Amino acid sequence: MSEHYYTKSPRSESDRRRFEAVLLGRRLTFETDAGVFSKSGVDFGSRLLIETADIPDGARVLDVGCGYGPIGLAIAAARPSARVTMLDINERAVGLARANAERNGIRNVTILASDGLEAVRGQTFDAVLTNPPIRAGKAVVHRIFEEAHGALAPGGVLWVVIQKKQGAPSAAAKLEELFGAEHVRMAARDKGYHILRAERANNC
């Protein structure tokens, strides 16, 4: 069994590879490695999240579990006025994301190693995006949801991609518990993947 990507310091032997992907109309080059999520290319769920999330110009954006960077870097490249912060517990992934930002000339990003949202405690964001580490277990995923709710500015939105078979209904239930059912909806659905949108109310 391959090493779990939700690991602070992967021990798997390096196996670097490089590929190009067109995201939000921009061609980006990514380098990936063993021990990170979806090392062979941008996964379908992340692509769907990137295409669905409605990120306004100038937004403060947080990408939780950024991996080698496709979600956060695609948004940063498409929204030069946005300020994008990217987090991952996996130090190898963080190094790759930083190198990929440099490789693509993307400057409006800050990329940090972090267990959950620990590294940005006290900061607030207009949008949080996550393709959560399902293999790490429900407790980890729900903690990300809880911390994201706390980090959103009033009116801010959490965007989540999750497969139905990997727990989309229970994820939606948790989001409704945190945000209120009236503030949670399915923004997109394709090939078994659900994009959940949860908006923090102005009065909470």
Short names for language-model regions:
Residues 45-130, 136:
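Conserved SAM/SAH cofactor-binding pocket of Class I
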Residues 155-162:
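Conserved beta-strand signature within the Rossmann-like core of class I S-adenosyl-L-methionine
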Residues 1-24, 34-35, 39:
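N-terminal auxiliary segments of SAM/dcSAM-dependent transferases
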